[in-house]
């Protein structure tokens, strides 16, 4: 399973926290982190957008959204 997290510089710690939580839940997950200058926090499962906003939501909510799609 491939998850990509695209985040603005101010949200880097949130992205790394989400990556850690996903790796704890799914041992086979590959997580790519991509920083951007835009104000954006987006999570993609394979090529589909799971979450996208200009602010962060909690990790459990994003993990729930991913679980709905797998």
What are these regions (language model features)?
Residues 36-40:
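Short Gly/Ser/Thr- and Asp/Glu-enriched loop/turn motifs at secondary-structure junctions
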Residues 49-70:
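Non-catalytic, surface beta->alpha helical segment in thiol-disulfide oxidoreductase systems
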Residues 41-49:
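A short, hydrophobic beta-strand/beta-hairpin element that forms part of a small beta-sheet core
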Residues 29:
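PLD/PLD-like phosphodiesterase catalytic module centered on the HKD motif
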Residues 1-25:
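Local sequence-structure signature of Cys/Sec-based thiol-disulfide redox active-site neighborhoods
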Residues 32-34:
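General small-molecule cofactor/ligand-binding pocket signal
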């Amino acid at each position: 399973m491939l998850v990509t997290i695209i985040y603005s510089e101010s949200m880097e710690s949130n992205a790394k926290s989400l990556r850690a939580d996903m790796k704890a839940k799914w041992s086979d997950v590959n997580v790519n982190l991509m920083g951007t200058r835009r104000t954006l926090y987006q999570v993609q499962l394979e090529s589909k957008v799971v979450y996208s906003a200009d602010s962060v939501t909690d990790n459990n909510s994003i993990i729930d959204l991913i679980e709905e799609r797998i």
